[in-house]
């Protein structure tokens, strides 16, 4: 089904081009190793770090669209020097709806962003790891991260992430920035990129713009259009940026990331939710008008399906809940329908773009 495959083929930047790693790294970069080596290092005790930063999102006329991505890449390399973790490839697309009126800026839908995280974390977790940390370079990404963390908790998996609004990250900027107003392509963010990738910054185009600072909503460069007017796409005082400020902020921010990762490494794992009772009403055989058949079964605390009495792929593609009566897997979407008594009586199936109804056999 096309919608399900999008996160895998279009929404993730694997960053697999040849790179020179620091010889002092303690971390292992997943993209650099073979599957046999991955089998050795993806243990239950491993912490997997996932950098998340947009590679196509406006950051004013002076910064590149890849500003978030540049920061995510830099921070993952800083973390690699400090802790023996597994670092996954960087996610370069996500939920950034506030910037889509600026050419070159991209966003996914909320469900795509959330499911992208769930898909990748569940895939890696199947090999052992139950502790995940996202280096989150963004704010609009938080709702998807929060919901993904809540869902994964019920599966016995820890997901934690950096959040600029937490006091420890706010404190990282104290004593560095000269102007309080800001939040996007501002003094701090511009300073970060000046330090990390100075050749990509054109400070002659930097301006101080707080027109979009006063009220919530998406930004727009067009006067009289819906949303917050921000002619530059900047919220804050970009002209105050200096590479030295970026260096200091980066060091402080990395310290907070490492503290977070240490807490993930040592926290108690959640107890997975027992689904045996909740899923009981879905189990059984379903038949379609054209002879289609689907068996819904239960194994290892998860539901699985067998379509048209074909191969049993329960170990490969279990069903995951999207809502109370909606489940998804690699190729399918299932929506279960109940009668007035609350009993499951029908099943809507979307399989690789084909949609059909089935009735539960009594």
Please provide the spans of the model-predicted regions.
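Intrinsically disordered, low-complexity segments enriched in glycine/proline and serine/threonine
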Residues: 5-6, 259, 348
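Peripheral terminal and inter-domain segments
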Residues: 269-362
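Compositionally biased, low-structure terminal segments
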Residues: 6-11, 128, 283, 335-337
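Hydrophobic alpha-helix-in-membranes signature
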Residues: 6, 50, 88, 317-320
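Bacterial Sec-dependent N-terminal signal peptides
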Residues: 1-20
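Extended, histidine- and acidic-residue-enriched regions that form the cofactor-binding/catalytic faces
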Residues: 19-97, 103-111, 115-132, 137-270
């Amino acid at each position: 089904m096309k919608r399900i495959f999008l996160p895998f083929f279009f929404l993730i930047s694997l960053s697999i081009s040849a790179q020179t790693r620091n010889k002092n790294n303690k971390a292992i970069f997943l993209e650099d190793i073979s599957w046999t080596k991955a089998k050795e290092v993806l243990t239950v005790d491993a912490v997997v770090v996932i950098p998340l930063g947009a590679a196509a999102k406006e950051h004013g006329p002076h910064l590149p669209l890849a500003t978030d991505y540049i920061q995510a890449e830099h921070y993952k390399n800083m973390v690699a020097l400090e802790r023996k973790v597994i670092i996954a490839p960087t996610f370069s697309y996500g939920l950034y709806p506030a910037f889509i009126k600026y050419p070159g800026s991209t966003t996914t839908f909320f469900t795509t962003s959330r499911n992208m995280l769930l898909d990748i974390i569940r895939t890696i977790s199947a090999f052992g790891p139950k502790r995940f940390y996202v280096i989150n370079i963004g704010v609009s990404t938080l709702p998807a991260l929060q919901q993904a963390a809540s869902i994964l908790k019920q599966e016995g998996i820890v997901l934690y992430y950096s959040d600029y609004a937490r006091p420890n990250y706010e404190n990282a900027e104290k004593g560095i920035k000269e102007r309080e107003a800001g939040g996007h392509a501002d003094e701090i963010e511009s300073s970060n990129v000046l330090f990390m990738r100075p050749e990509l910054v054109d400070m002659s185009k930097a301006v101080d713009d707080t027109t979009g600072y006063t009220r919530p909503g998406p930004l727009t460069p067009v006067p009289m259009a819906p949303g917050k007017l921000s002619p530059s796409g900047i919220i804050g005082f970009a002209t105050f940026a200096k590479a030295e400020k970026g260096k200091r902020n980066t060091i402080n921010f990395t310290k907070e990331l490492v503290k977070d990762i240490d807490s993930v490494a040592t926290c108690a794992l959640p107890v997975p939710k027992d689904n045996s009772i909740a899923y009981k009403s879905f189990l059984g055989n379903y038949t379609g008008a054209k002879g289609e058949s689907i068996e819904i079964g239960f194994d290892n605390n998860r539901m699985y399906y067998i379509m048209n009495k074909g191969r049993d792929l329960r170990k490969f593609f279990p069903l995951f809940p999207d809502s109370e009566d909606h489940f998804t897997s690699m190729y399918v979407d299932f929506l279960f329908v109940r009668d007035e008594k609350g009993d499951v009586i029908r099943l809507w199936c979307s399989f690789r773009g084909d949609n059909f109804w089935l009735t539960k056999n009594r």
